[in-house]
């Protein structure tokens, strides 16, 4: 089972990725983890990537794709893999196709922008303990205060509405085109084309999990 998981920030990809990993016994592969592992191991690609990162540059698609191809040959990928945060761009997606890296399913967790803004901008955190609340879905007993200590709760900068809107704009501009790319690929009917599945990312976590797993088994 080789899966790409797409969805806007706040759509719940991280939670669903855990369920997919456990259900199909496949590793979750993120480019960040891959880069760190390759740099630590001192592989040729890792050293190349380190040189770029130390200079403050962005690691090229060629290096990323090389790391991906190396990573998916490892033993834990025998049953497949789940790509997390990759591909991010059309050139990366095209390179995967050209390099013969077949994907079985592309799953999009679909959530309306306004719902995401409400989810993220409503989060409040107790910094000392890491406890997370939500003004609507999981409010503290006393507004703005941690249940256990009575300390003030804070809103992380990342969760402020303006920041969330900017992150969604970046997603729509950069990653959203991937949805169209994979939809087109799926409709071309090639034998190795992935199946494209859109899953509604609203409702309880268990409801969404059931929809995702049912789509992957379908």
From Swiss-Prot:
Its main location: cytoplasm. Residues 139-160 are annotated as: Disordered. The keyword Disulfide bond does not apply. It catalyses: AMP + ATP = 2 ADP. SUPFAM superfamilies: P-loop containing nucleoside triphosphate hydrolases. ATP binds at residues 10-15, 123, 132-133, 203. It comes from the Bacteria. GO terms for biological process: AMP salvage. It is found in: Cytoplasm. Its EC number is 2.7.4.3. Belongs to the adenylate kinase family. Catalyzes the reversible transfer of the terminal phosphate group between ATP and AMP. Plays an important role in cellular energy homeostasis and in adenine nucleotide metabolism. This is Adenylate kinase. The gene is adk.
